[in-house]
């Protein structure tokens, strides 16, 4: 039986590819998609969800827009990474359908309430919508199987020296998620920076030759440009968000550890840092499954295999 999931995202090139991977996978039943502000403004990320679902001919999936800003902060966006539209590069279709007449939290709550079994929430942007759901609907916590997030790092940040972008945008929301008591799976930079797509991988996707694989290759062409900066030391572009979906499909591709994670919300230099108690120094019980390594080739092969679904 397919695993029911709710996808909360802020497309974003890697979010878009996570959507492509999820909807090409019969093991997953995507119940709804909600958008968060992050990689671009809330209006643009919502539009990008609708554009991707129009491309994939999945306008049957309910969509709703989420919070327009973080819980306690002003919004920061990553337009230097994702471009003016949030999905610069390919020519994507205009949306042929409209979002639901409700908020992201309302759609999430309705989906959980109506599900016969607990639902996995996959969150690949800032955690604002998920935190609002947890705070406003404690009665629905038991309907959440787990929360799989792309965010954080055990070491180096990618937005500040200490913080990864998604967590930095709304650290208060991320702290609510980690301390919720619901199982959390964290795909942080430790693993996503190893999930790099090289130029030859992009050409492999392009050669599959269907409209979706071509769009994915064009998304990667644009995404690679930012990551060519030699400061990163990358060979390709790290495909952060699809690691969440890939872990659900093939957990054997990933090495994980069980650890306690907290989020720094106050620090002078470390706001947005995920503090991972790797050596069990706090005495706190682990609250997260933390991905630390990935079989890169297996990850690329999975993407290539699933892109053939769209032939």
From Swiss-Prot:
GO biological process assignments: nucleobase-containing small molecule interconversion; purine nucleoside catabolic process; pyrimidine nucleobase metabolic process
Enzyme Commission number(s): 3.2.-.-
GO molecular function: purine nucleosidase activity; uridine nucleosidase activity
Protein name stated in the entry: Pyrimidine-specific ribonucleoside hydrolase RihA
Role of this protein: Hydrolyzes cytidine or uridine to ribose and cytosine or uracil, respectively.
Short name of any one Pfam family annotated for the protein: IU_nuc_hydro
Keyword Hydrolase listed: yes
InterPro entries xref list: I/U_nuclsd_hydro_CS, Inosine/uridine_hydrolase_dom, IUNH, Pyrim_hydro_RihA, Ribo_hydro-like
Family: Belongs to the IUNH family. RihA subfamily.
Keywords from the UniProt entry: Glycosidase, Hydrolase
Residues at the active site: 240
Origin: domain of life: Bacteria
A single GO cellular-component term on record: cytosol
Recorded name of the encoding gene: rihA
């Amino acid at each position: 039986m397919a695993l029911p999931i709710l996808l909360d995202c802020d497309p974003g090139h890697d979010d878009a590819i996570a959507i492509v991977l999820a909807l090409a996978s019969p093991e997953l039943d995507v119940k709804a998609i909600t958008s968060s502000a992050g990689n671009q403004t809330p209006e643009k990320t919502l539009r990008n969800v609708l554009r991707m679902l129009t491309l994939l001919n999945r306008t049957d999936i309910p969509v709703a827009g989420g919070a327009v800003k973080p819980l306690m902060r002003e919004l920061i966006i990553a337009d230097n990474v994702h471009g003016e539209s949030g999905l610069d590069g390919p020519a994507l279709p205009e949306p042929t359908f409209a979002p639901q007449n409700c908020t992201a939290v309302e759609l999430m709550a309705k989906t959980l309430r109506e599900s016969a079994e607990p639902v996995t929430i996959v969150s690949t942007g800032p955690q604002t919508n998920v935190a609002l759901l947890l705070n406003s609907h404690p009665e629905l916590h038991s309907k959440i199987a787990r929360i799989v997030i792309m965010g954080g790092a055990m070491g180096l940040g990618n937005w500040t020296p200490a913080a990864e972008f998604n967590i930095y945008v709304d650290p208060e929301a991320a702290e609510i998620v980690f301390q919720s008591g619901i199982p959390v799976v964290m795909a942080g930079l430790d693993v996503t920076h190893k999930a790099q797509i090289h130029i030859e991988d992009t050409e492999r996707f392009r050669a599959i030759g269907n409209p979706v694989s071509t769009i994915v290759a064009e998304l990667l062409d644009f995404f690679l440009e930012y990551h060519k900066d030699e400061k990163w030391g990358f060979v390709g572009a790290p495909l952060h968000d699809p690691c969440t979906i890939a872990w659900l499909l093939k957990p054997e591709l990933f090495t994980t550890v069980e650890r306690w994670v907290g989020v720094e919300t106050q620090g002078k230099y470390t706001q947005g840092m995920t503090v991972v108690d790797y050596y069990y120094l706090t005495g706190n019980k682990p609250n997260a499954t933390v991905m630390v390594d990935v079989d890169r080739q297996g990850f690329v092969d999975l993407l290539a295999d699933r892109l053939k679904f769209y032939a």
